[in-house]
Amino acid sequence: MKWPVRSGLVPPLADGFVARPESAPGLAEVLTPGTAVALTPARAASAAIAPGAPDWRGIVGKTQVAAKFAESLWQSRDIDLLVWVNASSRVSILSAYASAATVAMGTDPAGDAEAVAARFVSWLSETSRPWLVVLDDLSAGQDVDGLWPAGPTGRTLVTTTELPASLGQEHLAVFPLSGLSRRESLTYLLGRLTEDRGQRTGAIDLADVLGGEPVALWQASAVLDSSVMSCRDYLDQYARKRDLLAASIPGRPAATAITWTLCVEHASGLLPSGPVQPMLILAAVLDGHSIPGTIFTTAAARDYAGRAAHGLTRPEDAWWCVTTLRRAGLVTIDETCTPPTVRMHPALQAAVRSASSGDVPERAALAAADALLEAWPAEDGGAGLADSLRSCAASIMRLVGDRLWAGNGYQILFRTGQSLQDAHLTMLAAAHWNHVAAASERFLGAEHADSLAAGDRLAESFLAAGRAMEALPWFRKVLSNRISMLGPEHAATIEFEMRMGRALLAAGGAEEAVTLLERMVSERGQLNGAAHPETLDARDALADAYCAAGRMREGIRMYQRTSTERARAQGQYHAATLATCQKLADAYLVANRIKDSLAAYKQVATGRERTLGPHHPSTIEIHSRLAMAYQSAGRLATAVQLHERARSDSERILGVDHVDTLTRQVYLAHAYYAVGRIGDAVSLLRDTAQRCDLVLSPGHPLTQSVRESLANIAGG
C-alpha cells in the first residue's frame, strides 16, 4: 500500500476562496495530534426556529474552513490519512468508515459495515500514522455512538450548527466561527470581480451590508459575475428586497435571506423560459450535501421541470438549467466527480421549500423519487455514489413519508433497502425492511407481490444480521402466502423453502430443517431431474442439515453422492463441485476419517490451483484446511510447512491485518506448539494479540480466542 491515502470527497473550495486569518485564526494551533475540535457558529441562538424554516444563523462557512484545513494538511504531508465524512446520518458515517477501512487497512469491503467501522475506529486509536477525520455537518450525537475517532496521532474535526449535548467538551474543544471580517469580505468580493473593474463600484458598502455572511457574499458575487451590474446597482436591488421582506417577517432579515431571493430572480432572467425554478425545487428536496447530477437529467426530472417550459426533451437542456443555478449562486457543482456532484446549502433548501406554495414541495419530492429511481444504477457504483443516492432517498422520505405509497414512489424504498444490503449495513437494512414490510402490508395488502417481496427481504436481512430467530416468523409468513398464491409446486415457492431450510439451520432448528429439506430434495428431483443444479443445491443443503443434527453418516453419504453427480453434470473443476467436495472433506475431518479428509482436501486444492491460481483467497483457504488435516493425521512437519505457506500467502494477498490472515497466524502458532516450538508459538500469539487489539473489537471472537491460547500456552 502506498501512503498517504485519502477517502471521501472533500468539497472543493469556493471560487475566489480567501484565507480567514481574522475570522478563523489559530485552528492549526488548536487542532493538534491527539485532539478534536468542533467548528460551530459563534452567534448564539436568539430564537427558536420553526420546523422546516431556514436557519440562517449557522451559515458561517464551517465546511469551507474545514475543507481548507484538510487540504492544507494533505498538501504539506502532515497526515498519512485524510477521511472526509458526511456526518448527517449514521448510515453515511458507517458507509464512509467502511470505505476508509478498505483504503487504509485493506479491509474486505464485503464485511459487515458495523464491524468494519468498529475495527477502523480501533485502528485509528492505535496506528502510528498521522491522520485527520472530518465529520461534516454532525447533528445527532447518537450517530457517532461507538464510532468516535480518537488516537494519539490523529485529529478529529467536526462541523456542526449546534454541538450535540451528548458530545460535550470532554470529547472536543469548541472553536466558535463567525462570518468573514470586513477586510476578508472585501478581499473576496474584489477577487471575484476581476473582469470589469467598474463592477467594483460600491464594493466596500456591499461588503459592510452583507455582514460577512459567506453564502450571502458568494451569492451576491455570483449574480454580479454573471451580469453587468455594479456593486452599487446590486445594493439598490438588495435594499428594495430587504424592505419587502422586513414588511412580511418579524425582525431584521439575515443577509442570506435576501440574497437568495435575488439569485432566484437572476436565474430566471438568465433562462427565462421557465424550467429554472422547478429544477431548483427538485434540488431543494434532495440531500444538499451530495446530489448525483444524473438525477437532474433523467426523463422524470425533465418531465417535472419541463411542465413550466413546454418540455425539456434533451438531458443537456436539463443540465443547462442546473448550471444556470450555479451561475446564479444557488448551487455548486463539483465536476471532478463521476457523475458530477451538485451541492446546495441546507438552509437555502429549507428557504426554497418554505417559499414554495401549497403542495409544490411534496409534488417535487414525488417527482424526485421517480428521478432518483431512474438514476440509480443496477450496481451501486461505488460507496460514495451509493451513500449519496441513499441520502437523497432519505431526504425524500422525511418530506413525504407515507405519501410515497399513494403512487409508485414507494419503489425508492425497495431500492434503498437493496442498497443497504449491498453495502453490508445489515442492522440498518433490517430496520429499514421492518418498516417497509409493515407499511407495504398496510397500504398494498398482505398478498400484494411487493408485500411478499418486502417480507422476503426482511427475512433475509434479519438472517444476515445474525437474528435468525426473528427471521423465522417472516420466512414462515412469506412461505404461507407464496403457497396460497402460487401453489406448493411453483418454482418460486420451492426456491423460498430452500432458503427457509438454511434459516432453520442458522436458528438451531436442524431436525426441522432436515424434514423440510428432505421434502425439498424430492420435489426438486421430480420437478427438475436428479442432476439439475437446483436439485444438487438442495442436496447440499440437506447434507448440511444432517451434519448439524449430528447425523454425520447420512451427511457424508449425501455429500459423496452430490459430489459425484456434480462432477458428472458440471465438471470435476466446476466451482460448485469443488465447494461440495470441500464440505465433504470438512465432514470427514469432523468424523475423524482423516485419510479420506486428506484425499478430499487435496482434490479441492488441485482444482482451486488449476481454476483460480495458487494465490487466490479461496486457494489459500483450502491450503489452510489441508494443513489442519495433516495436523490431525499427526504429520506435523508437513502441517507446519502448509500453515506457513497459507499465512505468508494471506499476508501478501489480503494484508497483515486481515482477519483471515490473523486466523491463519493462530493456526500456525498452534502447529508450532504441537512440534515443541513453544517460543515461536508464544511470540506469534503475542504478535497476533497486538494486531487483533489494533484492528478488531475487544469482544471479537478471534481476539478472545487468541487471549485464551496465550493464557494456556504461556500462562498469560
List each language-model region with its residue ranges.
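Intrinsic-disorder-linked linear interaction elements in eukaryotic regulatory proteins
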Residues: 293, 298-302, 317-323, 337, ...
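Aliphatic-rich helical/repeat scaffold segments used for oligomerization and domain docking
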Residues: 1-438, 442, 453-457, 465-480, ...
